[in-house]
Structures are given as structure tokens and as C-alpha cells.
Amino acid sequence: MAETPLVEFDNLHVTFPTSGEHVQAVRGVSYNIMPGETVGVVGESGSGKSVTAMSLLRLNEMMGAYIPQGHIHFNSRDHGRIDLSQAESSVVQDIRGKEISMIFQEPMTCLNPVLSIRTQLTEPLFQHQNMEPEAAEEKIVGLLNRVRIPDPRGKLNQYPHHLSGGMRQRVMIAMALACEPALLIADEPTTALDVTIQAQILDLIKDLQEEFGMSVMFITHDMAVIAEMADRVVVMYHGEIVEQGPVDQIFHDPQHPYTKKLINAVPRIGSMTGKAAPEKFPAVA
């Protein structure tokens, strides 16, 4: 018997009303995310990859967007198989942060600057699991330890501005995992970090995925990250899917010209020689 997808986008369309017209940001998107699988969604800015992801949690509605056509089926632990595009707001609110969590590319703008780390990490536990404060604190200390934050208990009374960018991203990951979600959406989670910290965060996400057994929807414009993280790849361009398939197939036998350009855009050591290489600046005396 075939395994049921955790998430199934079926001919999804997302439209944003603007002055005088309606802009179709996503058009006819269809793909699945299986339990325990990492699906990499890749494309340039404006391709519709983040809009598709935010449709899962109905976050686009805050900006006036609506879904005129299509479905988003989700295998919920508590609500059964439901269509998130048509579910009651209360159901989506219950799933948000509990069964589907999201981490973003700039944690400083996503963490509340006036709330302590303790307050922000315990909120989903109070809301979704009705935990007592003492039990919630013990759980978040354990989570901070799992995301490799040194002296986790000592960080609880600190605020986001006390932490480095890499530490803030680890706090975001801990918050996203607090209720042990079935799906983690990672929307460009390493873009604002330096290269060394990027590698650490990617390794951390992979380790935590294996530990929690969750699926990951990894959104990026970086094909090198996709090659490292994804089992399958969905390539988006101008709100549509132009190609999708297993990661090895996409990298070794890409069919669409846009996919080929994305792969060729990945820098390779020694790939630029002669006239193709950029001019070197003169040495400083």
C-alpha cells in the first residue's frame, strides 16, 4: 500500500489584490511532501516559492491574498486529512506552530526584541500543550541544548539583541521544534549568516530532522544548498513549476533551461580563467 503524502499541493493558485488588478503570484502548483522527506523548493526572488509555503499556514491572508483555485491537503495528527486552503481559521491556528512550523531567513526581525528568550520559547508550549511553567522551562532548556546553544539555562533571561545571528537562528529553530511538528518549513534560513555559520545551521537541521522524524520544506535560491539538503527538488519560475524530480536527476540531467542556468550559477573553484575571470584589483602598497 502506497504511503500517503504528508502534504499535497493540488493545482494551487494564489492571488494578491493590488490597485486596479489582481496579481497571480502562484499558478497551478502541484507537488507532494512525503513523511520524513526533504523537498527543496528553488527559484529566484519572486518565483513564488515562499508564497506557496506560507499558503500552508494561511499567512498570505494577512496581506490580502486569497486562493481562487486549488487545494492543500495535509495529514494532520489531530484533525485527520484536511484541506488547509478551506479549513476553518481555528483549525489552521491550531496546526500553526504545532504540526507545521516555520523558520525564517532573518531571525532578528522574527523574534520579538522586547520579550525574553524564555517568554518566546514557552509561548507555543502554553498555547498548544497547556504545560505548566516549570515543565515548559525544562523542555525549552532541553531544546536549546539540542540546538547546541551553550549555557542554555543562562540564555533564558536574555533578549534577542544579546545573541549573535547564528544564536538567534538556533533559538528560532528551537521555537519551531517545541511542539515536535510533522513539517518544518525552512525559508532561506541561512541567507543572513556567514558561510561558516551557514554550514553549522544546515548540519543542525539535518540532525534534528533525523532525530524528530519530520519532513522539511527547504526554500532557497542556492542550488548548492539544495544539493546538500534535499531528497527531491521543485524548481519554480514566475509562479509556476518548471521542473521537479529527485535531486540526483535534477543535477545530472536537468531538462528545463532555467534549471540549467540555476545549476550553472553555482560558483566552482577554478571555473573562471583567462578573460572570463574578473579583473584583480592592484595590490595595496
What are the roles of these predicted feature ranges?
Residues 78-101, 119, 127, 249-254:
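ABC ATPase NBD coupling module
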Residues 232, 244:
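Short, glycine/charged-rich "phosphate-handling" switch motifs in NTP-dependent
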Residues 73-77, 134-154, 263-264:
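Conserved ABC ATPase "signature" region
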Residues 3-5, 22, 81, 150-154, ...:
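Short catalytic/signature loops enriched in Gly
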Residues 178-182:
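A short, proline-enriched helix->beta-strand linker immediately N-terminal to the Walker B motif
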Residues 226-228:
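A short, surface-exposed alpha-helical micro-motif characterized by mixed small hydrophobic
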